[in-house]
Amino acid sequence: MTTKELINKNDKVKKARNHIVLFQPQIPQNTGNIARTCAATNAPLHIIKPMGFPIDDRKMKRAGLDYWDKLELHFYDHLEQFINQCHGQLHLISKFAVNNYSQATYADGDSHYFLFGREDTGLPEDFMREHAEKALRIPMNDEHVRSLNVSNTVCMVIYEALRQQGFQGLELKHTYEHDKLK
C-alpha cells in the first residue's frame, strides 16, 4: 500500500461513523431512549417523518434525559430524502432478514447506517424487497415473541458494530470521584 493510499484509508476511518436511523417512530419513550444511546455512542440519530408524536413530547424528552444537547439529530420528510443523503453502508434491521447482524462486518472503515422500522409495522415491504441483501436479523424465538423492542435492538446493533471497531472514540475505562468498586 502506498503512503497516499494509507493516508486516504486513515482519513476514511476517521470520518467513518455509525448512524442510527428511525423510520416513522411511534413511541416517544423508545425514541428518547434511543437518543440517549446515540449520545453515549457518538452516533448521529436520523428520524424519518412522520413521527407518531410531537418532537417536544414530554415522555420522549424525559427518556432522553439531559443528553439532547449532546446529540447530532437529523430529520427527513420521507424515506427517499434520507436515502439520497446516505453516504455509507445501509443496513436494514428486520425480523424478516436472513443474515445475522453479528456476522456482518462493520470494521471496514465505512460509515454504517442502521435503519429501524416503525414499532408497529416495521419497514415498508416494497423497500425491504428492493434492498433484501442489506437486511440483518437479531436471532430470537419467533414462536413466543412477535418482535424485540426497537430501543433494545438499537442498543444491541450499535454495540456490536462498536465492538468490531474496537469501541473507537469511547472511554473503555473511566475514573469516578466516588468509585463504588473501591
From Swiss-Prot:
- Residues annotated to bind S-adenosyl-L-methionine: 93, 117, 138, 147
| GO CC term, one of those recorded | cytoplasm
Q: Catalyses which reaction?
A: cytidine(34) in tRNA + S-adenosyl-L-methionine = 2'-O-methylcytidine(34) in tRNA + S-adenosyl-L-homocysteine + H(+); 5-carboxymethylaminomethyluridine(34) in tRNA(Leu) + S-adenosyl-L-methionine = 5-carboxymethylaminomethyl-2'-O-methyluridine(34) in tRNA(Leu) + S-adenosyl-L-homocysteine + H(+)
> What EC number(s) does its UniProt record assign?
2.1.1.207
Task: Fetch the Gene3D superfamilies from UniProt.
Answer: 3.40.1280.10
Q: Which residues form a coiled coil?
A: none
Q: Which GO terms describe its biological process?
A: wobble position ribose methylation
Q: Print the keywords alphabetically.
A: Cytoplasm, Methyltransferase, S-adenosyl-L-methionine, Transferase, tRNA processing
- Compartment(s) where it occurs, according to its Swiss-Prot or TrEMBL record: Cytoplasm
InterPro entries linked: Alpha/beta_knot_MTases (IPR029028), SpoU_MeTrfase (IPR001537), TrmL (IPR016914), tRNA_m1G_MTases_N (IPR029026)
GO MF terms listed in the record are:
RNA binding; tRNA (5-carboxymethylaminomethyluridine(34)-2'-O)-methyltransferase activity; tRNA (cytidine(34)-2'-O)-methyltransferase activity
SUPFAM superfamilies, per database record: alpha/beta knot
**Protein task:** Could methylate the ribose at the nucleotide 34 wobble position in tRNA.
Q: Which family does it belong to?
A: Belongs to the class IV-like SAM-binding methyltransferase superfamily. RNA methyltransferase TrmH family. TrmL subfamily.
Task: Please identify the protein, giving its name as recorded.
Answer: Putative tRNA (cytidine(34)-2'-O)-methyltransferase
Query: What species is this protein from?
Result: Streptococcus pyogenes serotype M28 (strain MGAS6180)
